Regions:
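A short, small-residue-rich loop immediately preceding and capping a beta-strand
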Residues: 80-118
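Short, conserved catalytic/metal-binding motifs centered on acidic residues
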Residues: 14, 95, 174
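Short glycine/serine/threonine-rich phosphate/pyrophosphate-binding segments
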Residues: 18-21, 41-45, 96-103, 121-125
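A glycine/threonine-rich phosphate-anchoring loop and its flanking beta-alpha core
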Residues: 107-188
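Short glycine/serine/threonine-biased micro-segments
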Residues: 12, 89-93, 167-169
């Protein structure tokens, strides 16, 4: 049986990498739409701006409404993508934000870059977006044809994330290990 590795096209990890974000995305396009929460922008906005100051790419910021829903995806597409001429989608935040960025990129056929700010989910690297209703109830899985073009893990940002979320990420990784072993044993 063949073994296949499915992963992002490029994975970048290290301290201070958000300060180089603009340089990393230059090859994907010239105008990036950065999806981020307002509180996230207060924490890392200066690093993102510095990364684009040293780049030929420019950025526009869209504040995420905290729910990965079809309504939110449509809002972002209508207000920012269709009217803003962006050619790259960047999601900076947690799992729901990453899933929203991937869904927006999928529906608009744009490259996507995911920069997690917590290490508690596998959403940044997966070819899947989980969509919810506006009330936070599960709606659907959106299976994507490819993984993100770039996943950038700024370890300075991750090191400052809440401990409970890091512990949750460790638990998720351990569970994934046992899930993979069970799948392999069953021949799935």
């Amino acid at each position: 049986m063949a073994k296949i590795l499915i992963s992002p096209s490029k994975y970048i990890q290290g301290p201070g990498e958000l300060k180089k974000l603009g340089q990393y995305v230059e090859n994907l396009g010239k105008k990036a739409l950065v999806l981020i929460t307002e509180s996230g922008y207060k924490r890392v906005g200066s690093a993102i701006e510095a990364g684009f100051n040293d780049s030929q790419a420019v950025m526009d910021v869209c504040y995420f409404n905290r729910e990965c829903s079809k309504v939110e995806v449509d809002r972002i597409i209508d207000k920012y993508v269709n009217q803003g001429d962006c050619d790259i989608i960047i999601g900076i935040g947690g799992g729901k934000l990453a899933d929203t960025a991937k869904a927006v990129a999928y529906y608009t056929k744009k490259p996507v870059v995911v920069c997690p700010t917590i290490a508690s989910t596998d959403a940044p690297c997966s070819a899947l977006s989980v969509l919810y209703t506006e009330d936070g109830v599960f709606d659907q899985y959106l299976f994507l044809p490819k993984n993100p073009d770039i996943v950038m893990m700024d370890t300075e940002v991750i090191s400052k994330s809440p401990v409970r979320l890091t512990v949750a990420g460790i638990g998720d990784a351990l569970a994934t290990y046992f899930e993979a072993r069970a799948c392999k044993a069953s021949g799935a």
